Amino acid sequence: MRKYLIFICTVLLASCLNNDFLERYPLGDPTAETAFETYDNFKAYAWGLYETLPSLGYGSENSTDDISYNQTRGTSESNWIRKLVTIPDKKDNTSWNYYSYIRRVNLMLDRIDGSKMTDVEKANWRSVGYFFRSYRYLSLLSAYGGVPWIDHVLSDDETELIKGPRASRDEIAGHILEDLQFAEKNINVNGEGRNTINKACVQALLSRFCLFEGTWRKYHGLNNAETYLRECKRVSAELIQTYPNVADCYDDLSVHWN
């Protein structure tokens, strides 16, 4: 009898060590482990990534591009060109906050391989993720040059980012180029319909990035400037050939803005 009692107690004690029930996920609420299974799951998640894109406004690009003139708003990025920007002594988190966005993109990218999608569908959503991640890394590249390269979801230990190694400008630019070239080849040509990221959007960003990086390297005496400038020429020519006119009638655009 004593042996049976010891056996029963041993079994009960062993069952207490099984804490698998603590790892169960809510049946009615999506989680990172359950929300990325189908094509529509990724489509729904990707909608939230569009918020990083700038809103459209008349003349807004004049204040964020390479144009510099006296009437430009005082807070615009053109102040870099006019040499009116001063570097603050204290820490500025503005650009580093882009990493919280990059983490959201990486969260989607990390779940693609384990989904139920076909290989073609996986390549499409990987392309969408690469577009958005490249878009934000281009901002970091233009502001800092070399920065930490993060292509996966980090652990809760913040030192992996804050105290992690700083990748070189060559490495960051190379990753952006590689990701956008992959996206150009694999994204759905027409995206998910109107006002969604498609092949032309990827090509436009690729052209813009390569022109920026190629000219920066050329005029700062860095290597591989021709690599980026040739790629800019190639993809720009294809865009122009595909879309020779942005609008059928330019007057219609003027009437719209007026």
Q: Across the structure, where does each feature detected by a protein language model lie?
A:
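Short, surface-exposed recognition loops and adjoining beta-strand edges that mediate ligand/DNA contacts
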Residues: 60-71, 150, 188-204, 215-258
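Conserved, well-structured interaction surfaces
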Residues: 39-43, 47, 51-55, 75-144, ...
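Sec-dependent N-terminal signal peptides
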Residues: 4-13
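Proline-centered turn/helix-capping motifs that create local helix->coil transitions or kinks
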Residues: 20-21, 57-61, 69, 140-149
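Membrane-proximal, proline-rich intrinsically disordered regions
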Residues: 16-60, 226-227, 236, 250-256
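TPR/Sel1-like alpha-solenoid repeat signature
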Residues: 130, 203-209
